[in-house]
Amino acid sequence: MKYHISLRTSLFRKLCLICLMGFISLTNINSQPSIGSFGVWDRGETMDINEYPFIKGSSCDASWNQVEKMSGVYDWSQLDQAVERASMNKTSIYISFAAGPESPDWIYTNGVPKVVTDNIRHAEKFPHYPFYISPEYQTYYHRFLTEAAKHIKSYPEEKRKTIAFIQVKTGCTGDECAYKGEPLDQKFSLEKSDPKWKKFRLETFEFYARLFYLDTDLKISLLLNSVTLESEGVKNEYVEEWNWATTTLKDGFGIKNGALSRGHHLSGERLAVNDFLPYLVDPKGLTLFRRSEMDQTWTRPWYQLNVPLNFYWGAINALNSGQSVWDITNVAIKASKEYGFDYTFYFFNKYAGQIFPETATDAFCALHKGLDAADTIAYPENFFGQAKKDNVVRMEKICASYSKYGAANDDKKALTFGQVQQRGDQTGFNDVGWEIWPDNYSRFLYQIAPDETSIPLWRIGGRITDTSSIYSRFARGFEHSTGKDALYFKLHEGFSQDAKPKVMSITVVWYDSIAGSTWKLDYDAGNANMKTAITVTGKGDKKWHHEAVTLNDAVFRCGGTKGSDLALVNTDDKDDIFSLMEVHRGEQVLPLLRPTAEVRVIKGYEKGIKYGEEGDESVRIKKKMEGEKNKEGDKQK
């Protein structure tokens, strides 16, 4: 069926564009969210910041079907309350205007075709969808967005300032696909790569930009999903969208990447870090911010092996990728306090806003090695086998070469999973993956020549259980027998800007495994030789410890051994183990930020629920639909 633009539709569009051009200024404006708003956010609007003070902001989805239940009648009460609450709490908020399957039903009796798909998992939540490219849909959709912009402009300035950004949602939720599943009637098909769908998305981007970003009365930054720059040797489907964003939103914009904060060693994370990090941390020119959310991944089998540990390394992974905003579900926020893993949220807040080295107050390096089977230089094909995502033999061979240091693959089936299936169905810790992050995780603090001077370690203290320390997942250490007796570190250029003595505080997290073992922390004090800050002797208690020291004469201009600012040095023939180093500009901040000594096991989830298992939402919906179908059949009989 063909859809023709009616005279009424055409006139409305023209009037919209004329009105828009009347109040839009096309000058460049600085509309980036405040760095102070970066950190952990409440994914809804329900959590009390007095009880959970780590919350930096919240989200409000003013969905079309809730705002405009009757054509032309708008109820903005939900949005008003959310903005008022953010203003009262002096926190931030981001807004989205979900449409697509969350469009009001009246549009389907006013010319918009209704689309039904074969997807069972989302059938209850999204029973139908609009045909996005129909002129009638776009007319009503644009009218709704225009009214949204008008309403936001009606807020006083102090309330508008609470709005950090607006997430652009063109399709289903924020996933940027037209439908969940395939349309039963294929004439409504709109694949992600379909030129018609790309055209619709770009036109929607343009409309949002005119309303919210280029309007000098609003100047609200936009967050986009499915925009990717060109990567060498990689086929990216969203380069056109990236090019539009970088030429239109010249002061910067936000990107969505959900996976990086939901775990570690996830397939494809290396590219997600490398592609965007130059625009997120110490950017030179175009500046982006990055948001992702914690969904129900933390209730799945892999996370439930040790919830505090997995949250911690998920946060570390996200910070390493330059993540700015981390949306957390209210259930996870409540559990974090009850079970003592809210330390991770405070840690994330500490570093999320450290964007520019000249003004950063903190830097960290979390010691880690990921065995990336896609790396043919580190793991040559002539020895380890062909580099293919499904080559489990290659992955196992790579892992075996590090097994003496604790590397293992607990769930071999999951080695070939994509990151979505990993999060849902993986049941163990794997130290090999495909395009996983291979190096240390860091922000402004880097280890010099890690593999030449130290050894990587996994599962420190033995098999990881639900009560293992968060630090036991990864570490690095000395290996005296091979001459690896020091770990050298340097700060990002600009963190320490001159050769004058400065006050800097250092924290080192280490594992005390050998009684009588000794090591020291040296630093660059501007002299020919490095100066010793502390010397530590182990007790052999098999526990993780924090050593903290404040330096009053730190120069940190890479004047130490191997061009280092700091060094962990072995002072005997025993091998010590380290997990984390932090640098703080100034005196130590009190009270000191530390994880709970005792890891508390979360009750009620135990083994976690895989996708499609009893208890999973998709199974419940499927059974409900089958039951309704059987009832209908009985009636007909």
Which stretches of residues belong to each language-model region?
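Substrate-binding cleft/loops of secretory-pathway carbohydrate-active enzymes
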Residues: Q167, C172-A178, S189, S193, ...
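An active-site-proximal structural segment forming one wall of the substrate-binding cleft
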Residues: S87, K125-Q167, F200, T204-F207
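Extracellular carbohydrate recognition and processing domains
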Residues: A528-G560
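Extracellular beta-strand ligand-recognition surfaces/modules
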Residues: E547-M581
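Short, surface-exposed beta-strand/strand-loop-strand elements in extracellular ectodomains
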Residues: G516-N529
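N-terminal substrate-binding region of glycoside hydrolase catalytic domains
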Residues: Q32-Y132, D295-T299, Q323-I333, F345-Y346, ...
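Glycan-recognition and processing domains
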Residues: F383-G494, E582-H584, L590-A597
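Substrate-binding cleft of secreted/luminal carbohydrate-active enzymes
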Residues: Y94, A98, K250-D431
